[in-house]
């Protein structure tokens, strides 16, 4: 829901009411003649347990919880006499050391009058108090706050702040101060005394001139690493450290806050405002920082403007240097109250921030920052990070106090801000959806295991019933009789006699003891007598099985049988279990039977569904053999109870449930309530403190019997929801069932879920939070990882780190690595830290080098990248990436790793990379089609560069690329005979490329043959890469491609050449070689060729100006070469 759909409302708290005596006191304070009341707007408050109201010279206090059995009678206590207005800020109600009639702490109360007269009740039930006149130097008390609860005979301690800014510590006086309530007052910190007498003497006799400060309007304490007290006055904001104790820092409004307020006015007026005045109103802690409410005025406005500023958490340790965030508070309603000529608005505004709102990192699901006035309340909704706000404006909402009502007080609790009004009672200030009705009261029926305690008078009845159970279900052998008597003696608290009776059994092997105990317990839970009430019988079984567990534990039998193998026959099938499973099964079978009985008797629909279920259960062969016909008789056979949920789940089959929608949903709800009831009762039994804790073994009895039907029902619910025939209310109800039902299935399963299908379906149905809760609870790592991969980086990584710690024993870290690698999320995998992840990445070189770079292990990364580049035979782009990164890492290595091998590898393979990049796309498409990223060997590059091209220019460039490649390789391997042979073969291919029978003269060699054009290219063409001003192939490198023996090359040529052709070819090669020798002697600057298209506008102009000079320089260079050539000729 967006902020536009929210409205601020006064939500009535119906559970809190004013007692009759309090209402009478309100009436007594009403003056009919003047049509006004003496009740002030700061005379009432409350906390989590109590409410209190000041009325004239007394205080009323009563419990918040409304009792339906009796009227609320408040406690009345007398207040100290005062000539100044009282305030609940000087009242503290806390949990005292005394206990009331219901064993709960009886509240203590501390009241301080404005003049400093203290009254302290350690218990309101005693009505006795201690009164002391505090030495506060004639200052006026402003606020009292509790600092320490009473403990070890010491009274509670308090902090008292005066309107002059002085802080006093009130702590217990005497060794028994917790009972007497005696307190002593000590000044802790504050300004120099500014009491009434001091100010009067200063006026009469003069004194040292000091800058005066205004009176404190509010103060509060904040516990962080230190106990801080913040005092707010219109002109100064001060923070004291109580542990030092001293003033931590102080900020003057005029110097620190007023310039910020002036900037708002300047933005409005578009010029510098005149006579700007700012006044601090209130402050509160918000997101560890300090939120401050400020009022501001200027000359051209007749209103008081409201502003909020926020300072970061550094305020708790040092003086702030600036404001982090600030905003205007638009007070558009009740504008008459904000007149500049009326200063009362400053004292009638209160900043209220509940604890949960203050600690929340975002505004969602909070009521915002609330400002209260006797006539209205506003909320500022700040849905952004104050340090880095993304939205320029905050949400503002307003609500008016009912016009005929009167504000009595307010209270800031953990979740809400409460206001107490004369007529309307107590309400919370809530930011709710627009048009939202009064909150409905939802009650959650909890399944509670009944008490297992039995009084002395009850045991004879249980003992008689136990004898019937043993007699009907067990043979009369000495062992069973001894176990029976021993348990009877234990129940009657004759422990020694019980142990003596048990000696014969103790001497038996553990497995035999487990067998006897198992048969004894099953005789109890499978006992049934039609003369007994079902619920009474179930309660007896519950008590007896619980007490037997205690009996086994006390007698040392429990530890012996808990791991003993045990065979239990059910329906003719032998199930192998251990003693611990058997003990848990017995208790939980009784609990499940109780849950089924409770469900069956709750309403008629459930009873009808139960009848349909029992009819099918009675036809099961195992049940038929017992001859049971009474539908309720099965409750006496707890050993068969697992058939009921299984058959109940079958009732949801399409061919059983029926086509009528209303009937179908009735059966759905009935079955789901049954399964949920069984689940809740079993879980409650496992958590019950009155039973012996039994460890849950991997294969539990529920998994072997009926747990799978819970998954079946969950899948049927999902199928029903997908059909879309259910209403919104039915859909919500079914979703609630599926959470409970599937939670039980997962808890009983012996395998850890992984990407569970039902959980994925729940996410798709709009229950991701609940699905994640189940996935986290039952360690479905696949679902957890899959879901959080869709969140932002911060949330995802924070959650993964939390899971690594939470599931350390389950090795979530390695699961995460495998999942991310398997699903191609290498980006997330590389964000994981730790030595185990490093070891994992060592198995994957393509990931390992990234981690090594991140850890600044550049030497290791270079070696890894080199091996990857050497092994890459398919993708040229990957080869380039690996080779380039290997070189850069090697150059950056400072960890002592020997990277000479990497540098040598780069030197050898760099020519291949460089020349593969220069092969035109047209040639690559001919070679590989659309696979332009294919790797090419040196032979492939030579072959395709020398292939027949569409024109002579392309052919020349192809041979140039081939010779350039060979030249670069020969520079790396100068002694390679194989490269020299390839150079000769390339010259042979160049000569054979032409039809020499068409060449008639030496001039034709230059103009008509590829050989001649290539020779001309060697001495006259020096192209450069785009953006480079120097040629890609310099003369000194071009000299390397000359054949070692031109005669041999020409002899091997297949061209139809004559003697003249051969002499022309040799002459050409000789002339080119001489020209290249001369060019090689020239400096590199002689080949500078600026790219006129790749420079900026200023450089362009400069180069255009020098263009003619550079052209003349180039021409002189060419003329010089021609003259030298003519002279040699």
Swiss-Prot record:
Function in brief: Important for early nematode development.
Protein name: Nuclear pore complex protein 15
Family annotation (Gene3D superfamilies): YVTN repeat-like/Quinoprotein amine dehydrogenase
Location, primary (coarse class): nucleus
MF terms in GO: structural constituent of nuclear pore
Family that this chain belongs to: Belongs to the nucleoporin Nup133 family.
Cellular compartment(s): Nucleus envelope; Nucleus, Nuclear pore complex
Entry annotated with the keyword Transport: yes
Pfam families noted in UniProt: Nucleoporin_N (PF08801)
Cysteine pairs bridged by disulfides in the record: none
InterPro entries: Nucleoporin_Nup133/Nup155_N, Nup133-like, WD40/YVTN_repeat-like_dom_sf
Organism this protein belongs to: Caenorhabditis elegans
UniProt entry keywords in alphabetical sequence: Developmental protein, mRNA transport, Nuclear pore complex, Nucleus, Protein transport, Translocation, Transport
GO biological process: poly(A)+ mRNA export from nucleus; protein import into nucleus; transcription-dependent tethering of RNA polymerase II gene DNA at nuclear periphery
Gene expressing this chain: npp-15
Top-rank taxon: Eukaryota
GO cellular component, one term: kinetochore
């Amino acid at each position: 829901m967006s902020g536009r759909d929210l409205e601020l409302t006064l939500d009535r708290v119906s559970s809190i009411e004013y007692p009759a005596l309090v209402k009478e006191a309100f009436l007594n304070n009403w003056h009919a003649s003047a049509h006004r009341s003496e009740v002030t707007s700061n005379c009432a408050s409350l906390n989590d347990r109590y409410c209190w109201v000041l009325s004239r010279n007394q205080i009323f206090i009563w419990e918040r919880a409304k009792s339906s059995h009796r009227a609320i009678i408040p406690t009345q206590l007398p207040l100290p006499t005062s000539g100044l207005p009282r305030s609940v800020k000087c009242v503290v109600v806390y949990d005292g050391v005394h206990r009331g009639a219901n064993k709960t702490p009886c509240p203590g109360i501390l009241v301080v009058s404005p003049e400093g007269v203290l009254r302290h009740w350690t218990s309101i039930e005693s009505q006795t108090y201690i009164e002391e006149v505090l030495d506060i130097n004639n200052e006026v008390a402003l606020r009292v706050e509790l600092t320490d609860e009473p403990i070890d005979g010491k009274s509670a301690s308090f902090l008292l702040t005066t309107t002059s800014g002085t802080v006093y510590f009130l702590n217990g006086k005497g060794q028994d101060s917790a009972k007497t309530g005696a307190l002593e007052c000590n000044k802790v910190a504050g300004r120099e005394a500014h009491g009434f007498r001091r100010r009067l003497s200063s006026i009469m006799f003069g004194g040292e001139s000091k800058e005066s400060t205004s009176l404190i309007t509010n103060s509060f304490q904040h516990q962080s690493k230190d106990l801080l007290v913040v005092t707010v006055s219109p002109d100064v904001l001060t923070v004291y450290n109580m542990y030092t104790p001293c003033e931590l820092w102080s900020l003057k409004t005029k110097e620190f806050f007023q310039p910020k307020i002036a900037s708002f006015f300047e933005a409005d007026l578009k010029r510098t405002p005149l006579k700007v005045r700012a006044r601090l109103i209130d402050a509160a802690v918000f997101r560890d920082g300090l939120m401050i409410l400020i009022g501001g005025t200027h000359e051209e406005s007749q209103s008081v403007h409201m502003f909020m500023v926020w300072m970061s958490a550094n305020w708790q340790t040092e003086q702030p240097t600036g404001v982090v965030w600030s905003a205007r508070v638009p007070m558009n309603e009740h504008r008459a109250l904000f007149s500049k000529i009326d200063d009362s608005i400053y004292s009638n505004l209160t900043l209220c921030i509940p604890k949960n709102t203050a600690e929340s990192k975002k505004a969602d699901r909070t009521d915002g920052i609330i400002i209260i006035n006797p006539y209205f309340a506003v909320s500022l909704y700040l849905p952004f990070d104050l340090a880095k706000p993304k939205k320029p404006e905050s949400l503002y909402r307003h609500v008016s106090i009912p016009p005929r009502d009167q504000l009595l007080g307010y209270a800031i609790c953990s979740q809400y801000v409460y206001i107490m009004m004369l007529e309307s009672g107590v309400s919370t200030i809530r930011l709710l959806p627009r048009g939202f009705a009064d909150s409905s009261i939802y009650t959650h029926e909890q399944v509670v295991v009944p008490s297992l305690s039995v009084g002395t008078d009850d045991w004879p009845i249980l003992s008689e019933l136990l004898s019937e159970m043993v007699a009907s279900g067990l043979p009369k052998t000495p062992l069973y009789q001894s176990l029976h008597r021993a348990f009877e003696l234990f129940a009657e608290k004759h422990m020694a006699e019980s142990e003596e009776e048990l000696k014969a059994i103790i001497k038996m092997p553990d497995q035999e003891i487990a067998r006897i105990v198992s048969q004894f317990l099953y005789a109890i839970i499978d006992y049934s007598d039609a003369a007994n009430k079902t619920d009474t019988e179930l309660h007896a079984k519950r008590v007896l099985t619980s007490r037997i567990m205690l009996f086994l534990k006390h007698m040392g039998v429990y530890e012996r049988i808990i791991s003993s193998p045990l065979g239990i026959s059910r329906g003719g099938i032998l199930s192998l279990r251990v003693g611990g499973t058997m003990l848990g099964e017995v208790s939980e079978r009784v609990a499940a039977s109780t849950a089924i009985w409770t469900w069956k008797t709750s309403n008629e629909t459930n009873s009808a569904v139960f009848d349909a279920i029992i009819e099918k259960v009675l036809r099961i062969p195992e049940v038929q053999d017992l001859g049971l016909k009474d539908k309720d008789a099965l409750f006496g056979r707890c050993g068969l109870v697992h058939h009921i949920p299984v058959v109940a789940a079958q009732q949801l089959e399409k061919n059983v449930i029926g086509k009528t929608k209303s009937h179908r949903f009735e059966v759905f709800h009935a079955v789901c309530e049954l399964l949920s009831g069984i689940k809740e009762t079993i879980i409650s039994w496992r958590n019950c403190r009155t039973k012996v804790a039994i460890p849950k073994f991997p294969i539990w009895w529920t998994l072997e019997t009926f747990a799978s039907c819970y998954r079946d029902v969950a899948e049927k619910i999902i199928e029903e929801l997908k059909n879309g025939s259910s209403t919104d209310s039915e859909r919500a109800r079914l979703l609630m069932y599926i959470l409970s039902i599937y939670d039980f299935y997962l808890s009983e399963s012996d395998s850890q879920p992984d990407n569970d299908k039902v959980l994925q379906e729940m996410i798709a149905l709009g229950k991701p939070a609940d699905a994640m809760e189940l996935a986290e609870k039952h360690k479905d790592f696949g679902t957890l990882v899959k879901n959080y991969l869709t969140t932002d980086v911060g949330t995802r990584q924070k959650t993964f780190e939390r899971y690594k710690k939470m599931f350390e024993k389950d090795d979530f870290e390695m699961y995460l690595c495998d999942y991310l690698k398997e699903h191609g999320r290498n980006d997330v995998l590389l964000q994981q830290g730790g030595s185990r992840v490093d070891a994992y990445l060592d198995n994957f070189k393509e990931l390992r080098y990234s981690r090594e770079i991140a850890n600044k292990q550049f030497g290791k990364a270079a070696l890894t990248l080199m091996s990857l580049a050497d092994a890459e035979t398919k993708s040229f782009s990957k080869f380039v990436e690996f080779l380039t990164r290997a070189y850069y890492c090697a150059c950056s290595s400072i960890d002592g790793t020997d990277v000479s091998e990497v540098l040598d590898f780069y030197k050898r393979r760099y020519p291949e990379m460089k020349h593969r990049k220069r092969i035109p796309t047209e040639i690559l498409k001919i070679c590989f089609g659309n696979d332009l990223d294919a790797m090419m060997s040196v032979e492939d590059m030579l072959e395709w560069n020398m292939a027949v091209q569409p024109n002579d220019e392309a052919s020349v460039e192809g041979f140039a690329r081939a010779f350039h490649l060979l030249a670069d390789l020969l520079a790396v391997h100068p002694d390679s005979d194989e490269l020299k042979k390839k150079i000769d073969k390339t010259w042979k291919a160049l000569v054979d490329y032409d039809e020499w029978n068409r060449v008639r003269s030496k001039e034709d060699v230059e103009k008509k043959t590829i050989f001649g054009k290539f020779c001309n290219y060697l001495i006259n063409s020096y192209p450069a890469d785009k953006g480079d001003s120097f040629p890609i192939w310099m003369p000194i490198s071009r000299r390397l491609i000359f054949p070692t023996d031109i005669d041999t090359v020409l002899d091997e040529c297949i061209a139809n050449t004559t003697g003249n052709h051969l002499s022309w070819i040799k002459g050409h090669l000789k002339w080119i070689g001489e020209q290249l020798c001369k060019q090689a002697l020239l400096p590199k600057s002689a080949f500078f060729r600026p790219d006129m298209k790749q420079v900026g506008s200023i450089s362009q102009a400069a180069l255009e100006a020098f263009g003619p000079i550079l052209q003349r320089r180039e021409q002189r260079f060419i003329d010089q070469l021609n003259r030298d050539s003519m002279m040699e000729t």
